[in-house]
């Protein structure tokens, strides 16, 4: 089965996409925000406005394959056109913090091998899941 974007195009390994809710009126895309005393926005959150697409994200699988399929282990990394000064020391690659279970961005020295995120079919759309040691969270 192929994963398709909102334009009906096949998801490409390393492609840049906006991650949006499946239904209108449920908020916007994903972006970064400051939480819990952070001095820079490091937490992945959903934009409140449905007209805000959020930040573009690169979705890639470590194996060098052209097309992303359901269940592949994926890394996700924001790729803003103009990163802020706060993010020059960050990779913008997603990681899940064990204690809080929040999705954050990684500092450069922690940046590789975080996944595994997966895209799974869900009803007529897809859901993004985090898997740790084969367990869905």
UniProtKB/Swiss-Prot annotation:
Gene3D superfamilies: 2.80.10.50. It comes from the Eukaryota. It comes from Neltuma juliflora. Disulfide bonds join 40-86. InterPro entries: Kunitz_inhibitor_STI-like_sf, Prot_inh_Kunz-lg. PANTHER family: KUNITZ TRYPSIN INHIBITOR 2 (PTHR33107), TRYPSIN INHIBITOR A (PTHR33107:SF81). The record marks 64-65 as: Reactive bond for trypsin. SMART domains: STI. One of its GO terms (molecular function) is serine-type endopeptidase inhibitor activity. PROSITE patterns: SOYBEAN_KUNITZ (PS00283). Heterodimer of an alpha and a beta chain linked by a disulfide bond. Keywords: Disulfide bond, Protease inhibitor, Serine protease inhibitor. This is Kunitz-type trypsin inhibitor alpha chain. The keyword Glycoprotein does not apply. Belongs to the protease inhibitor I3 (leguminous Kunitz-type inhibitor) family. Inhibition of trypsin. Pfam families: Kunitz_legume.
